[in-house]
Swiss-Prot record:
It is an enzyme of class 6 (ligase). Consists of three domains; the N-terminal catalytic domain, the editing domain and the C-terminal C-Ala domain. The editing domain removes incorrectly charged amino acids, while the C-Ala domain, along with tRNA(Ala), serves as a bridge to cooperatively bring together the editing and aminoacylation centers thus stimulating deacylation of misacylated tRNAs. Its cofactor is Zn(2+). This is Alanine--tRNA ligase. One of its GO terms (molecular function) is aminoacyl-tRNA deacylase activity. GO terms for cellular component: cytosol. It comes from Neisseria meningitidis serogroup C / serotype 2a (strain ATCC 700532 / DSM 15464 / FAM18). Keywords: Aminoacyl-tRNA synthetase, ATP-binding, Cytoplasm, Ligase, Metal-binding, Nucleotide-binding, Protein biosynthesis, RNA-binding, tRNA-binding, Zinc. SMART domains: tRNA_SAD. It is found in: Cytoplasm. Belongs to the class-II aminoacyl-tRNA synthetase family.
Length: 874
């Protein structure tokens, strides 16, 4: 049975049992700061289990994409070296939200595994474990399923505390928890290992294939186990493990999906295909996690999820290097993965080009430092120490881009221990430097437990309100006096709180002579807005009746830029391709800054086309309408949504005629014509695969255009051109003339250098076996090299060291006639001189260059060369 067939069978089985098939959630969890990546099927249902969310179904089944990698201590280093470790895997699951419980969960699992209609696994190949105190589950296995008692294993509290057991699941220190029952498959007595709970349980004979978690209790802060009113079920079955069972193989890497990927890896690296080669397995595993992460919006970076992705990519590239492939190859495997898994996960097909570009860019970036870093590491390992120094590990990490676990991987192959403590010291020193250099924005999270704020700002710019709370220095106070900086919470507010990339509104809150200047608006809680600013006159007290008024000019500018951003987003997708996704935005009164996923620079022609499309929509002057509707209705409108974002049951849909439909909670113009004019003023890369575009609107765009016009007129006047069309020709002619003069100057310098060099050789010091020239001249580094090469070519026994000082920096060049390189080496000579002037360098035995920073020591260094060379000639 192929892996793809097994996936479909599982979902079909549970669909026949009344379960709703729910598509896999993104690998990037939303609204769950406790998770780096989705790592289990239940992640997307966490709020349902906790009672915070309700679904229109009580039974669900999924094939969930999962990634388990992240943090220095993880299983990444084991991937490729064991039969079942992966960075990416699929978790098949069935879930009950207060519907069925233990009996049905166990019966469903048993039927799917053993029924001839489904998997038809021999019953005597299976074993079940239960929590020691879970008599209910034990009796279901024994009396209803008919499993022999010797193949039902009770597992107690084997982790040192009450309820701390392999067979007792807990979401956290408090909250839903309960016993679980695991199903194991026997790979055969020829494989070493014992049943769960035995001394040999870590062997590979008995492998867990399914875990059924019974959420039965709610653990309170005192540790009491209180029965849940509606117990639930969460199960998980690893697809790759189950495929190995169904295909009668022992290792996950032997299943059909991996066999095809392994052959592709061998093809692209030029390595011989062998199931004994860990590097092939590493790369085959890593192309899955990397491709799926990029498809779900993660891009390589130096922090968070992006850094985990970077680590995985670089580990794969290093293993390719180990197999002898030094050119970019990893991205070429994406097509093979799409062929294997694209039907089950259409996002792979949709994002194939983007995935390939992101991987190729990261490969190329790492290739620039991989060889140099490997040379440094090999040199350190060649010293024979059994432990790699922490400073070297840090240098590899900081300078050459070697993640810690990549270095650990290499050292593991050589049985070399890592100086982890030394590495941590270097890392902490770097973090301390970063903390000292960084300033932080004040935190808007203030203590508040009063009523929510009602936002009136979509339709009103001014409200009559009541002061609910006041803050000064982060603490609640009863009043703010003149000169006090703080925050105000009012019951009705026209001020938009920073959200969705749009900055918070500014304006005033006042009553009579009492005036508070609002300089920013932030959310203190989800539905509580804080107006931050300063009391410019009088006094403000809790309970005061006040007028809150938004600054119209700034609000209007914010609205123009925000509405223009929507039009630009749509135009970018139409012009550049459907792969374009929003990666970030900042809407202010001055401009809009928009970050998008795109593998290369946006061309001038593409920018012009985007501008044309946006301004066409502006000139159409269509109405901008907002409507609150259900998510289902919003999807029917074709509204653009942020990929992977989590939305509520009701959403706000913003429509601009036929030009743009998008979910948005921001403030916008009434008609597109209010934008006035749209102009992109900059475009550039901010990370691998991410471009940043900045644009302006309205009078700001007009002002920019007028400044450009003035600049062009100044250039026309300066170049004495007759018209704008003549300017370019004038500039090109001037540049050509300057280039010709530079060539003429270079020829003159070269001639002078040759003449100067001849005189230097005439004045050389005779050391018997050699003629020594050690002098400072006026020349650049290129001229120094040319002179030294010329002099050594004219003599069969010359030792030359020439120096020059340009902009306070020392340039050195040494040359030795080939007949003398057995005794005197140019690389050694230039290194000797460079170290004394605060620099370093080296090169070939006959020619070498270096630099330095201490020009004051140069005369003494040149004087010392005679003794140094003389000693070498003895």
């Amino acid at each position: 049975m192929k892996t793809s067939e097994l996936r479909q069978k599982f979902l079909k089985f549970f669909e026949t049992k009344g379960h709703t098939v729910v598509r896999s959630s993104s690998l990037v969890p939303h609204d769950d700061p406790t998770l780096l990546f989705t790592n289990a099927g239940m992640n997307q249902f966490k709020d349902v289990f906790l009672g915070f969310d309700k679904r229109p179904y009580s039974r669900a089944t999924t094939a969930q994409k999962c990634v388990r990698a992240g943090g220095k201590h993880n299983d990444l280093e084991n991937v490729g070296y064991t039969a079942r470790h992966h960075t990416f895997f699929e978790m098949m699951g069935n879930f009950s939200f207060g519907d069925y419980f233990k009996r049905d969960a166990i019966h469903f699992a048993w039927e799917f595994l053993t029924s001839p209609e489904w998997l038809n696994i021999p019953k005597d190949k299976l074993l079940a474990t239960v929590y020691a105190e879970d008599d209910e589950a034990y009796n279901i296995w024994l009396n209803e399923i008919g499993m022999p008692s010797e193949r039902i294993v009770r597992i107690g509290d084997n982790k040192g505390a009450k309820y701390a057991s392999d067979n007792f699941w807990q979401m956290g220190d408090t909250g839903p928890c309960g016993p679980c029952s695991e199903i194991f498959y026997d790979h055969g007595e020829e494989i070493w290992g014992g049943i769960p709970g035995s001394p040999e349980e870590d062997g590979d004979r008995w492998i867990e294939i399914w875990n059924c978690v019974f959420m039965q209790f709610n653990r309170d802060e005192q540790g009491n186990m209180n029965p849940l009113p509606k117990p639930s079920v969460d199960t998980g079955m690893g697809l790759e493990r189950m495929a190995a069972v169904m295909q009668h193989v022992h290792s996950n890497y032997e299943i059909d999906l991996f066999q095809d990927l392994l052959k592709a890896v061998a093809r692209e690296t030029g390595a011989a295909f062998s199931m004994e080669e860990p590097s092939l397995k590493v790369i085959a595993d890593h192309i899955r996690s990397c491709s799926f992460l990029i498809a779900d919006g993660v891009l390589p970076s130096n922090e968070g999820r992006g850094y985990v992705l970077r680590r995985i990519i670089r580990r794969a590239v290093r293993h390719g290097y180990k197999l002898g492939q030094s050119k970019p190859f990893f991205h070429k495997l994406v097509a093979d993965l799409v062929k294997e898994m694209g039907d089950a996960y259409p996002e792979l097909k949709e994002k194939q080009v983007q995935i390939e570009e992101a991987l190729k860019n990261e490969e190329s970036r790492f290739a620039q430092t991989l060889e140099t870093g490997m040379a440094l590491l090999e040199n350190a390992l060649a010293k024979g120490s059994k432990k790699l120094d922490g400073e070297i590990i840090f240098k590899l990490y900081d300078t050459y881009g070697f993640p810690y676990d990549l270095t650990a991987d290499i050292c593991r192959e050589r049985n070399i221990e890592l100086d982890e403590a030394g590495f941590e010291r270097e890392m902490e020193a770097q973090r301390a430097r970063a903390r000292a250099a960084q300033s932080f924005k004040a935190n808007a999270q203030l203590p508040y437990d009063g009523q929510d704020t009602e936002f009136k700002g979509y339709s009103e710019r001014q409200t009559e309100s009541k002061v609910l709370a006041l803050y000064k220095d982060g603490e609640q106070v009863d009043e703010l006096n003149e000169g006090d900086s703080g925050a105000v919470v009012i019951d009705f507010t026209p001020f938009y709180a920073e959200s969705g990339g749009q900055v918070g509104d500014v304006g005033y809150i006042f009553s009579g002579e009492n005036r508070f200047e609002v300089r920013d608006t932030q959310k203190i809680k989800a539905a509580v807005f804080g107006q931050f600013g300063v009391q410019t006159s009088g006094r403000l007290k809790v309970g005061d009746s006040v007028t809150a008024k938004v600054d119209d000019e700034i609000r209007n500018a914010n609205m123009r830029n925000h509405s223009a951003t929507h039009l630009m987003h749509k135009a970018l997708r139409d012009v550049l391709g459907r792969h374009v996704e929003q990666k970030g935005s900042l809407v202010t009164a001055e401009s809009t800054r928009f970050d998008i996923s795109h593998p290369q620079a946006v061309t001038a022609e593409e920018i012009a086309e985007v501008e044309r499309r946006v301004n066409e929509a502006v000139l159409a002057n269509v109405a901008v309408n907002a409507a609150i509707m259900s998510m289902e209705d919003a999807q029917k409108t074709g509204a653009m949504m942020l990929f992977g974002e989590k939305y509520g049951d009701e959403v706000r849909v913003l429509q601009m005629g036929g030009f743009s439909t998008e979910l948005c909670g921001g403030t916008h113009v009434s008609r597109t014509g209010d934008i006035g004019l749209f102009k992109i003023i900059s475009e550039g890369g901010i990370a691998a695969g991410v471009r940043r575009i900045e644009a302006i609107t309205g009078l700001n765009a007009l002002k920019w255009a007028q400044e450009q016009e003035r600049l062009v007129k100044d250039i026309i006047a300066e170049t004495k051109a007759q018209t704008e069309k003549d300017v370019l020709a004038k500039i090109q002619a001037g540049a050509a003339h300057a280039k010709a003069l530079e060539k003429e100057l270079a020829r003159a310098k070269a001639e002078l250098a040759v003449h100067a060099g001849a005189k230097l050789l005439d004045d050389a010091k005779d050391l018997g076996a050699a003629k020594l020239v050690a002098a400072q001249i006026e020349a650049d580094a290129a001229a120094l090299r040319e002179i030294v090469t010329d002099l050594t070519g004219k003599s069969d026994n010359a030792v030359i060291l020439l120096a020059a000082v340009n902009d306070g920096k020392v340039s050195l060049c040494a040359g030795v006639s080939k007949a003398l390189t057995g005794k005197v080496k140019a690389g050694d000579l230039v290194k000797f001189a460079a170290e004394q002037v605060g620099g370093k360098g080296g090169g070939r035995p006959d020619l070498a260059q270096a630099g330095g920073t201490d020009a004051g020591k140069l005369p003494a260094v040149l004087d010392s060369v005679k003794d140094w060379v003389g000693a070498k000639l003895v």
